[in-house]
């Protein structure tokens, strides 16, 4: 088979690398619209869609109310990839505006203060990926040398998870009751 210009061989019983097959046997579909928003800072909310503890990966929905205060200034310990689905937001440290339909990549080590002055508020869907449980290091002021307010971690997303949140735990156990679950792993062996 040719895929993206490369010849690949797919055979029944083939092995999967990275040990992922040992941890991920279930594919899940979550209807984000049915999950409750959880306020994490004044006027700012998250929904935990999927939490994958072995890889410190979180899929989320994020919302800021119209007129909400700035989200806390923070360092990214993680990579964040986000797609704006409603309104717009910006960073106090810059001049650009991230509009509805735009994709954002926020690199580890980046420091910024997100805000939204959109009359309808702002929403996004995204993924945090980290090399540790820590995702964000929140600061008291929009200054990277200011006092650390706290950490935002994978555990925080486990704490706000809805019953529908798909969770893969460190031991490979899968919990949550997403809208649909599938096991498409038959015929694939882990390496």
PLM ranges: what are they?
Residues 1-83, 88-191:
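Jelly-roll (double-stranded beta-helix
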């Amino acid at each position: 088979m040719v895929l993206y210009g490369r010849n690949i061989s797919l055979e029944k019983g083939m092995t999967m690398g990275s040990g992922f097959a040992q941890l991920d046997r279930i594919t899940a579909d979550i209807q984000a619209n049915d999950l409750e928003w959880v306020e994490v800072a004044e006027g700012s909310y998250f929904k935990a869609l999927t939490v994958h503890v072995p890889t410190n990966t979180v899929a989320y929905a994020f919302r800021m109310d119209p007129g909400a205060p700035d989200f806390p200034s923070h360092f990214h310990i993680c990579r964040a990839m986000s797609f704006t689905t409603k309104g717009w937001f910006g960073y106090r440290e810059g001049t650009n505006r991230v509009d509805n339909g735009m994709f954002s990549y926020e690199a580890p080590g980046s420091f910024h203060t997100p805000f939204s002055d959109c009359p309808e508020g702002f929403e996004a869907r995204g993924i945090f990926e980290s090399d540790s449980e820590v995702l964000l290091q929140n600061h008291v002021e929009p200054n990277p040398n200011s006092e650390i307010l706290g950490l935002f971690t994978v555990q925080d997303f486990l704490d706000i998870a809805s019953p529908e949140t798909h969770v893969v735990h460190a031991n490979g156990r899968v919990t949550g009751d997403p809208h649909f679950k599938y096991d498409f792993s038959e015929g694939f062996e882990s390496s």
